[in-house]
């Protein structure tokens, strides 16, 4: 058996022979990471990527200075989408070790689920994986309902049915109730709504291959809110929370939806489809209608919704939108506490009116006259939230997935956002 490479921490700079910018050095005892006191977590994560790039697949984190956040930063950079890596963790107290184990179980589940090929993870499989994860942490407190295919149309989930009907794999709505109180009449504290597009071709507004090749990850919002609920439960969540996952493929077929179609939603809104590649908001609308009907204190939806958010923030931050300044501030505080990157982008009342249609109340996409695509998408969603000015957060989760490796992340899913939402739920 190969001996694990020892990884130690030092606050001293590397020997000058390694260069004045060296973040790690190698010696007979192993590898030393040289912290600078400025961005130690980032330095550890980037160094872990380099260590993985050396082909080292077994490591032992030894010596002083390894706390849970430094351990987690190392794993965030060290984990990759293929191959097996083994880490011998340092001694942590019981609470930190339990927290680390929960992160390894749940956030790795999120990353692995997002990375799964679309052929292996259709709408039904995604919903079932979510159920299995949540049952593994709190099965006695979980009930759920799966509605799929033509049952969605019969129950007036017209956005989800319309988008998903073009695939041989039927669209699915997962409605899951986490109720630790044991009281079936207990108020719902929060609702989480996730976009679960298990593959997005763009439909008849078809994507180019360069934009389609990562679209197995278009269910990143659904995976992240599922992981967030599971993680919050491990941190002691004792309030009732409902989860709505809107799962579908967006494909081309003789039965697929078309430009010019009009979708009539249960809340009375009519939407003209002028871009079948703006499908995420169409499925989320159904989930938000259900969430609003619960009258919770808090609604959070999460979706890989727009390229505009990615243009603004890259893959480095999740974009946050809200009319509720106090609530937005609370989420940003949670993000800072969890060392996760969120950035608030504008959402104003006028964005709700920048989706004009000649044939319906709303268009599902903005025109060239209204180019703020991420903000108008959030404005669209607000039409399906009963009290949109209070208690609602929309997260356009552009940091869930990377098509190519960078200095701190392997290619694929990141798991970012799970800790922040869990923090907010348990604050």
UniProtKB/Swiss-Prot annotation:
InterPro entries: Leucine_aapep/pepB, M17_PepB-like_N, Pept_M17_PepB, Peptidase_M17_C. One of its GO terms (cellular component) is cytoplasm. The active site is at residues 207, 281. Its main location: cytoplasm. The keyword Manganese applies. Binds 2 manganese ions per subunit. Its EC number is 3.4.11.23. It holds the Pfam family Peptidase_M17. GO terms for molecular function: manganese ion binding; metalloaminopeptidase activity. Belongs to the peptidase M17 family. NCBIfam families: PRK05015.1. HAMAP family: Aminopeptidase_M17. Probably plays an important role in intracellular peptide degradation. This is Peptidase B. The gene is pepB.
């Amino acid at each position: 058996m190969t001996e694990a490479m020892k990884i130690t921490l030092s606050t001293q700079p590397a020997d000058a022979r390694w260069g004045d910018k060296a973040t790690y050095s190698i010696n007979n005892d192993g590898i030393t990471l040289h912290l600078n006191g400025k961005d130690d977590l980032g330095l550890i994560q980037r160094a872990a990527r380099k260590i993985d790039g050396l082909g080292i697949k077994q490591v032992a984190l030894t010596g002083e200075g390894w706390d849970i956040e430094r351990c987690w930063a190392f794993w965030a950079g060290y984990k990759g989408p293929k191959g097996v890596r083994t880490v011998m963790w340092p001694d942590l107290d019981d609470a930190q070790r339990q927290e680390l184990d929960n992160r390894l179980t749940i956030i790795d589940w999120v990353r692995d689920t997002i990375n799964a090929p679309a052929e292996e993870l259709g709408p039904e499989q995604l919903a079932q994986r979510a159920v299995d994860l949540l049952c593994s942490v709190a099965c006695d407190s979980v009930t759920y309902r799966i509605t799929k295919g033509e049952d969605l149309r019969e129950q007036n989930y017209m956005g989800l049915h319309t988008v998903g009907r073009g695939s041989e794999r039927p669209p699915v709505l997962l409605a899951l109730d986490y109720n630790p109180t044991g009281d079936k009449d207990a108020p719902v504290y929060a609702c989480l709504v996730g976009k679960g597009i298990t593959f997005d071709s763009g439909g008849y507004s078809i994507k180019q291959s360069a934009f389609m090749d990562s679209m197995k990850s278009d269910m990143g919002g659904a995976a992240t809110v599922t992981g967030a609920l599971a993680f919050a439960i491990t941190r002691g969540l004792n309030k009732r929370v409902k989860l709505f996952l809107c799962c579908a493929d967006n494909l081309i077929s003789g039965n697929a939806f078309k430009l010019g179609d009009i979708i009539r939603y249960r809340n009375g809104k009519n939407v003209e489809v002028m871009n079948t590649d703006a499908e995420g908001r169409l499925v989320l609308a159904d989930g938000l209608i259900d969430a609003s009907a619960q009258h919770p204190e808090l609604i959070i939806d999460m979706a890989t919704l727009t390229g505009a958010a990615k243009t603004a923030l890259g893959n480095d931050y999740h974009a946050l939108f809200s009319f509720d300044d106090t609530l937005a501030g609370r989420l940003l505080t949670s993000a800072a506490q969890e060392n996760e990157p969120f950035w608030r982008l504008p959402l104003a009342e006028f964005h709700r009116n920048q989706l004009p249609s000649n044939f319906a109340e709303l268009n599902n996409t903005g025109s060239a006259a209204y180019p703020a695509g991420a903000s108008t998408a959030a404005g669209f969603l607000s039409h399906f939230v009963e009290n949109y000015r209070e208690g609602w957060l929309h997260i356009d989760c552009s940091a869930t997935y990377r098509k190519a490796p960078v200095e701190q992340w392997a290619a694929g899913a990141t798991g970012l956002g799970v800790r922040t939402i869990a923090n907010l739920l348990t604050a």
